[in-house]
């Protein structure tokens, strides 16, 4: 049987005094849905309240004094990462700027479906930062672990939640509640809470929707999954050049390629699985891998061009890397949360300055490599170094107003993905040229 999967916005019920984000004293009426074999996005109306109380999951709680919010997206709206449709700004744009912590969303839905039909919910696919989903007061699940003082956050992924109670005579009223936690690391002008509403429908339709959402998520990160394999292959080729016992050194190039492969693969690991928590991902990426990658790539190009091999550059980069790691850890919003905001702001500002010094040393190394070497191989190497730099210094390019992502065919492709794809091709050609040059030298002996 073919099922039509469609996402239709619900009719907004109730009056608003000023806007959808303002407080309302009007009780939210129950929304009625005739499902059949279909899927409906639960765009609203929702009751919303900051704070946390597990009793708010109960259908018996009076939420008439809560705020009323609408999650209906603008036509064509999608998230800024992989292109998932249905995006709306978070609570920071809805009267709660600067708020970090817990909040609840509640809505009542009367479903008029087929008798004994299996119903399910598709969880929200974009939430700052994690959530638990309840139906009629019963916890259905969610991507976060809420057992500690603050939740352990994992990536929000497309998820199906079977509804526990089948409609009696085809009709049932559900109280859907979402307990949301926003992590300090997600603070931002548009952030906070649900960005893409959950959907309700018959189980088969929800399964199809889930497959579509996973396909979109897969397409958004498939390049990040493939590029690390290419980086590892390039590292193996560079290591083979070392085995030839040439006078050139490639150990820093091998290290830089492997670190970059890890950096890219770690993003896929976080967004496709629940192996790594948000804080673990933050430490591995921002505190460890990024500083190490900046240093090793500068040393890799120094050795490639054969310029100024005195130890001063290595000593400076080691010091900068250690400083970068310490400052980056201090500046993490979740680390040592009792520390003053001013201390963290200073640490993050100093990280920006360290990155600028790293960028200056990186560009200096490329410039020194080109002086007096305007042959094809040197120009290609400089081009490859610039392409890597586009990924390494993505934050600085974004601050300069350089566009960071495009959505060809509705799927997000980042500036870094484009740059690394070009770099892989150029470096592969350069390594083959080096192999050919070494072979010619051996033949001439």
Language-model region placement:
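Bacterial N-terminal signal peptides that target proteins for export
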Residues: 1-7
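N-terminal signal peptide c-region/cleavage motif recognized by signal peptidases
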Residues: 17-19
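Extended carbohydrate-recognition surfaces in non-catalytic/accessory domains of CAZymes
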Residues: 23-116
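An acidic-aromatic loop/edge-strand motif
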Residues: 52, 153-225
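Aromatic-lined ligand-binding clefts that engage carbohydrates, nucleic acids, or primary amines
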Residues: 66, 109-136, 140, 176-178
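Solvent-exposed beta-strand/loop surfaces of large extracellular or lumenal domains
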Residues: 77-86, 139-160
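First transmembrane helix
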Residues: 213-244, 352-370
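Interfacial "cap-and-anchor" motif at the non-cytosolic start of specific transmembrane alpha-helices
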Residues: 261-303, 307-316, 325-445
């Amino acid at each position: 049987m073919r099922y039509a999967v469609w996402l239709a916005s619900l009719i907004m019920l109730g009056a608003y005094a000023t806007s959808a984000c303002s407080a309302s004293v009007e009780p939210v009426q129950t929304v009625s849905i005739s499902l059949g074999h279909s899927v409906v996005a639960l765009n609203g109306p929702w009751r919303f309240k900051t704070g946390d109380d597990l009793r708010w999951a109960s259908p018996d709680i009076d939420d008439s004094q809560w705020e009323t919010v609408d999650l209906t997206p603008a036509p064509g709206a999608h998230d800024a990462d992989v292109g998932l449709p249905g995006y709306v700004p978070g609570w920071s744009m809805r009267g709660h700027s600067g708020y970090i912590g817990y909040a609840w969303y509640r809505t009542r839905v009367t479903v008029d479906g087929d008798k004994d039909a299996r119903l399910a919910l598709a969880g929200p696919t974009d939430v700052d930062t994690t959530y638990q989903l309840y139906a009629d007061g019963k916890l259905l699940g969610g991507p976060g672990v809420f057992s500690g003082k603050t939740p352990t956050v994992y990536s929000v992924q497309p998820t199906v939640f079977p509804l526990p109670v089948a409609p009696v005579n085809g009709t049932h009223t559900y109280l859907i509640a979402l307990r949301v936690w926003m992590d300090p690391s997600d603070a931002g002008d548009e952030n906070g809470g649900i960005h893409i509403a959950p959907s309700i429908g018959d189980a088969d339709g929800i399964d199809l929707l889930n497959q579509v959402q996973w396909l979109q998520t897969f397409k958004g990160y498939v390049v990040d999954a493939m590029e690390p394999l290419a980086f590892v292959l390039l590292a193996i080729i560079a290591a083979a050049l070392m085995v030839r016992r040439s006078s050139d050194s490639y150990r820093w190039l091998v290290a830089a390629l492997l670190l970059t492969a890890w950096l890219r693969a770690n993003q896929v690991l976080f967004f496709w699985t629940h192996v790594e928590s948000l804080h673990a991902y933050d430490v591995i990426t921002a505190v460890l891998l990024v500083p190490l990658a900046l240093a090793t790539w500068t040393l890799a190009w120094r050795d490639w061009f054969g310029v100024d091999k005195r130890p001063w550059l290595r000593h400076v980069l080691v010091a900068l890397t250690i400083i970068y790691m310490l400052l980056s850890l201090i500046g993490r919003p979740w680390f040592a949360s009792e520390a003053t905001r001013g201390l963290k702001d200073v640490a993050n500002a100093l990280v920006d300055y360290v990155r600028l010094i790293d960028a200056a040393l990186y560009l200096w190394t490329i410039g020194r490599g080109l002086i007096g070497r305007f042959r094809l191989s040197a120009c290609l190497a400089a081009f490859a170094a610039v392409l890597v730099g586009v990924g390494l210094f993505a934050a600085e390019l974004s601050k300069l107003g350089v566009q960071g992502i495009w959505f060809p065919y509705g799927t997000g492709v980042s500036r870094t993905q484009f740059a690394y794809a070009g770099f892989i091709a150029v470096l592969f050609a350069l390594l083959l040229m080096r192999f050919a040059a070494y072979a010619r030298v051996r033949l001439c002996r």
